[in-house]
């Protein structure tokens, strides 16, 4: 030990012995400059303190807490250790502040910034904070809590941890907001923005908060809740989580709105727009909300409701959900109006137009609205799928558990008439009305569109009857203009005839198919269409004769009426049917053809199998077994000889003796004897 170091050490030891003779102190002070301050050690504590910074913040340790602070900045503040703490301070800077250690506490503090804030540790807590920024905020830890705090920003806000809580806080921005943790909670917040909002965690809650924006809003977590919050925008709104709720919101916009979650709810909202609206979730509700617009409206979800909201526009409407309702809302237009769902309602709204109307849903309702619908409120459990493709569509109100799908077809009452034309046209279905009938004619055919009144149901198909009607008009003279359908005389006369038929036959009359005029005064030849079964030929003639006065009103003096009904062959009669014997013959032919096909298949299979298998010769020529043959007596079994083989079996080998005698040789025995 050099004399320059030994002298201050001995001086410190003497001062400790003089101050408290009953205590045993060990103090090592290392100084590399002049004008060192006093470093007293009390009550048997060991306090090697290291100070290398000027005016660093105070880091006290109280009540058996473990707080190893390290100071490496200029003008470091006091670092006392109390209640049996152990604080080895080391001083390596000029004008370092006093570092007392009291009552066996351990408080190593590390400070690497100028004018850093105080980091106290109380009541047996473990708080190794590290400060690497200028004017960082206070990070106190109380009541046996564990709070490793890292501060790397200027003027960061306070991050206190109380009552046995664990709060590792990381601050890397200027003027970040406070992040307190209370009552055994775990709150590792991270702040990397300027003036970030407060992120407190209370009552055993877990709240890892990450802030990377300027002036972000508060994100408190209360009563055992879990609230990991990430803020990456300026002035983001508050995201509190209360009563055991889980709320990991992420904010990446400027001045985003509040997203609170209460009473065991789960609310991970994501905000990526400016000035987003509030999205609160109450009473165990689940609310994943994504906001990507500016000035979006409020989307609250109270008691146990589930809501997914996606907004990609500016100024979207409110979508509140109450009492366990499910409302996924998608908005892609400017300034849509409110879409509320109440009391267990399900409301899916897709809007792609501007100025959408209000769509509230109450009491378990389900509604789907697409593209600029007008107001469609549904109350008391009704189901109303409404689709609108225009702006400002009409209102559809449905109450009392009704289910309604409406299709509007504007139809007006009254009659429909067309001006007679002299050009032939194609006939179309006639018009039907409950209040009046329509009868128009052309030279060849008149097309009448059906018009249904509000009191008559539309008919898809109407049976019709055609009548050939001819009569004479003796108060008119025939001229060449009646042969031209475009002439005024032709049009006037045809219009009068049609009006007469309409007045006489009323609703039974459907129209005139063809009409022509010829000479004889004026002879009218027409094909008239009536409703099927309404009239017959005799009734048509009698009614025309009875309404001669009505004919005079149309300037028609009719006579010589002839009516004949046209008979059209039906579809069944147009194609003659097959007689029964023909059908029977056809079935028989089909059966015979099927049997022939089966027989041919079986025959082919038999031929193939016969070619694959060999022939079985029961008495072959070279067989050795023939009861009455000239072969030797002992040859009792035949041997199989493959075709084309001249080698005989060794059991059939015969050796000649004196010329006529035959002997049988057993090759196995012969081989065995030779081997022996």
Swiss-Prot record:
The alpha subunit forms a tight, non-covalent heterodimeric complex with the proteolytically-released beta-subunit. Binds directly the SH2 domain of GRB2, and forms a MUC1/GRB2/SOS1 complex involved in RAS signaling. The cytoplasmic tail (MUC1CT) interacts with several proteins such as SRC, CTNNB1 and ERBs. Interaction with the SH2 domain of CSK decreases interaction with GSK3B. Interacts with CTNNB1/beta-catenin and JUP/gamma-catenin and promotes cell adhesion. Interaction with JUP/gamma-catenin is induced by heregulin. Binds PRKCD, ERBB2, ERBB3 and ERBB4. Residues 604-676 are cytoplasmic. Residues 404-420 have a biased composition (Polar residues). This is Mucin-1. It is found in: Apical cell membrane. The lineage of its organism: Eukaryota, Metazoa, Chordata, Craniata, Vertebrata. Residues 1-25 form the signal peptide. The modification Phosphothreonine is found at residue 646. Residues 463-570 form the SEA domain.
